[in-house]
C-alpha cells in the first residue's frame, strides 16, 4: 500500500516536471495580429457555401 502511494506521488511529480519543462507561454489575447500574415483565398465552393 505504501509503495502504491509512493508510486502515485512519483508519477505526479514526473508529469508536472515534464509539463513544466515543455510549457510554452500562450500568446496574449491582446497581442497585435501579425501584419505579415496573409488570409487564405476562398475557393469558389467556399464562396458558394457562404452565399447560401
From Swiss-Prot:
Region ranges (Disordered): 30-52
Keywords: Amidation, Repeat, Secreted, Signal, Toxin
Low complexity bias spans: 37-52
Signal sequence bounds: 1-23
GO annotations of cellular component type: extracellular region
UniProt modified residues of type Alanine amide: 51
One of the record's GO molecular function terms: toxin activity
Principal place of residence: secreted
Record propeptide residues: 24-41
Top-rank taxon: Eukaryota
Subcellular localization(s) per the UniProt record: Secreted
Tissue expression remark: Expressed by the venom gland.
Additional remark text: Not found in venom, suggesting that it is a minor component. Negative results: Has no activity against fungi (B.cinerea and C.albicans) and bacteria (E.coli and S.aureus). Has no hemolytic activity against human erythrocytes. Does not show cytolytic activity against insect cell lines. Does not induce feeding disorder in lepidopteran larvae after peptide injection in the vicinity of the head and thorax.
Descriptive protein name: Venom peptide 4b
Organism classification: Eukaryota, Metazoa, Ecdysozoa, Arthropoda, Hexapoda
Amino acid at each position: 500500500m505504501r509503495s502504491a502511494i509512493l508510486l502515485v506521488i512519483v508519477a505526479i511529480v514526473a508529469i508536472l516536471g515534464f509539463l513544466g519543462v515543455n510549457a510554452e507561454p500562450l500568446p496574449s489575447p491582446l497581442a497585435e495580429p501579425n501584419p505579415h500574415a496573409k488570409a487564405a483565398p476562398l475557393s469558389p465552393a467556399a464562396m458558394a457555401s457562404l452565399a447560401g
